[in-house]
Design a protein with these regions (language model features):
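Short, surface-exposed, charged/polar-biased interaction segments
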Residues: 37-40, 44, 48, 55, ...
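Non-catalytic connector elements of ABC transporters
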Residues: 92-96, 104-214
Length: 214
């Protein structure tokens, strides 16, 4: 009914919150089609990060009334400004591990992972080599197969099959990590697997401020 007015700007405050899951998916597509057809500005308020990622051309992420980051969906996903944004955007959420830098390695009491030269140079430039930091890595950037380096043994606590893929909830050296894996292989709770960290895709955050180190 509001769209009939042909306004310059439309404000939609969680319009799909009372719909069931299937209808929400359908209506997301319909609203996106309307946006393209009307070629007007729509300010869409939502607590559902999936709605934000799939519908927006630009996302404003807020916490406690304060803007955390503004950007295109892909930018916000790939270059989160801080740990709040990194943990909010993406499902399952980004994995976080607290540690320090030792030479060219990110280390905890139980893990040791080699950092690519480009990312190590940024950490050096920002003076982060001798400070506690947090490494973030998304579930799709941890792979259930062995490579030349950055391989760790993990134990599966829960294996969720979603159809085309598995969500593996694992324990790795005392850390709880989620791994996104293809469904070509079967995975089971209690199984031990080797996982590979794609460190070219990792993110680093200041442990105190939680701001991304870039």
């Amino acid at each position: 009914r509001a769209i009939v007015r042909e306004a310059g700007v439309f404000l939609m405050d969680e319009p799909l919150s009372n719909l069931d899951a299937k209808l929400r998916v359908q209506m997301r597509a319909e609203i996106s089609k309307l946006h393209q057809k009307l070629n007007t500005t729509m300010i869409y308020v939502t607590h559902d990060q999936t709605e934000a990622m799939t519908m927006a051309t630009r996302i404003v992420i807020m916490k406690d009334g304060i803007v955390q980051q503004v950007g295109a969906p892909k930018t916000v996903y790939n270059q989160p400004a801080n740990m709040f944004v990194a943990g909010f955007i993406g499902s399952p959420a980004m994995n976080f591990i607290r540690g320090t830098i030792d030479g060219d390695k990110f280390v905890t009491e139980t893990l040791k992972l080699t950092i690519p030269e480009e990312k190590l140079a940024v950490l050096k430039t920002q003076g982060s080599l001798h400070k506690p930091i947090v490494m973030g890595i998304r579930p799709e950037d941890i792979h259930p197969d062995a490579q030349e380096e950055n391989n760790i043994s993990a134990k599966i606590s829960v294996a969720e099959l979603t159809g085309a893929e598995f969500m593996l909830y694992t324990t790795v050296g005392g850390h709880e990590l989620v791994v996104r894996a293809g469904a070509l292989n079967d995975y089971h709770a209690g199984e031990n697997i080797t996982i590979h960290f794609d460190m070219t895709k990792c993110h680093f955050f200041d442990a105190e401020t939680e701001i991304a180190i870039r």
